[in-house]
Amino acid sequence: MFGVLNSDNHCAAVQQGNILAFGRTSSEFWTNNPTSSYRCETGGNRTDSGQSHIRRPMNAFMVWSRDQRRKVALENPQMQNSEISKRLGYQWKMLTEAEKRPFFEEAQRIQAMHREKYPDYKYRPRRKAVPKNSDKLLPAASSSMLCRQGNVDERWYPFTWRGGRTRASHSGTEDRLNSSQAANIVRSLLQQEHHCSSTSLRHSPETLAIQLSTDFYPK
């Protein structure tokens, strides 16, 4: 028995050592490989899409918020980027047309330069990645149905563990249980079902209404 336990512990230790060794080698590969480090810095594989991708020209709001965003971030270092964008959007709406005019003119100049540099440019928004169906969780109806099926299986098969493993083999069960014991088990289950059904029928609204009518209006 102790030999089996020691061998299991030894196997677990060997597996853990292999995992740690694989993690070290993979991390060394990523850090020593210049291509992989470039992917980590840029946030993905940009070897083919990075050269062909062309950024959109800035509009008037982007020209105005370029300096304002930096200023708000320095004044509020704990503020998140989404909150900064909300504040800048509100401030931009509060500006007058005269205050916005210089930024519109600058945006038109940037767009003209962009058209000259990239005459065949067309804006193509990136599509969001669609999650796989296998990663989705089961709906509530399916999970509740599985729970009900598990309860029914445990009720009608009392000689199985919850984990799905049988307590004994089929041959061992036949040796321990004879036909009379099996009949007694089935009879007790049927009696329980009959008792539950009769109890629910006794306390049903229709039965109570009939009893009340006979009490108030005797024949």
From Swiss-Prot:
* Span of the signal peptide: none
Top-level taxon: Eukaryota
GO CC terms? cytoplasm; nuclear speck; nucleus
* Compartment(s) where it occurs, according to its Swiss-Prot or TrEMBL record: Nucleus speckle; Cytoplasm; Nucleus
User: What are the protein's GO molecular function terms?
Assistant: calmodulin binding; DNA-binding transcription activator activity, RNA polymerase II-specific; RNA polymerase II cis-regulatory region sequence-specific DNA binding
Against PROSITE patterns, the record matches this protein to:
HMG_BOX_2
Task: Look up the DNA-binding region in the UniProt entry and give its residue ranges.
Answer: 54-122
Q: Does the keyword DNA-binding apply?
A: yes
Alphabetic keyword roster: Activator, Calmodulin-binding, Cytoplasm, Differentiation, DNA-binding, Nucleus, Sexual differentiation, Transcription, Transcription regulation
Q: Keyword Cell membrane, does the record have it?
A: no
Classification via InterPro entries? HMG_box_dom, HMG_box_dom_sf, SRY, SRY-related_HMG-box_TF-like
* One GO term of the biological process aspect: sex differentiation
SMART domains noted in UniProt = HMG
Where the protein is mainly located, per its record? nucleus
Q: What does this protein do?
A: Transcriptional regulator that controls a genetic switch in male development. It is necessary and sufficient for initiating male sex determination by directing the development of supporting cell precursors (pre-Sertoli cells) as Sertoli rather than granulosa cells. Involved in different aspects of gene regulation including promoter activation or repression. Binds to the DNA consensus sequence 5'-[AT]AACAA[AT]-3'. SRY HMG box recognizes DNA by partial intercalation in the minor groove and promotes DNA bending. Also involved in pre-mRNA splicing.
What is said about its interaction partners and assembly?
Interacts with CALM, EP300, HDAC3, KPNB1, ZNF208 isoform KRAB-O, PARP1, SLC9A3R2 and WT1. The interaction with EP300 modulates its DNA-binding activity. The interaction with KPNB1 is sensitive to dissociation by Ran in the GTP-bound form. Interaction with PARP1 impaired its DNA-binding activity.
What protein family is recorded?
Answer: Belongs to the SRY family.
Protein known as: Sex-determining region Y protein
> What is the organism of origin for this protein?
Lutra lutra (European river otter)
Q: According to the entry, what is the taxonomic lineage of the organism?
A: Eukaryota, Metazoa, Chordata, Craniata, Vertebrata
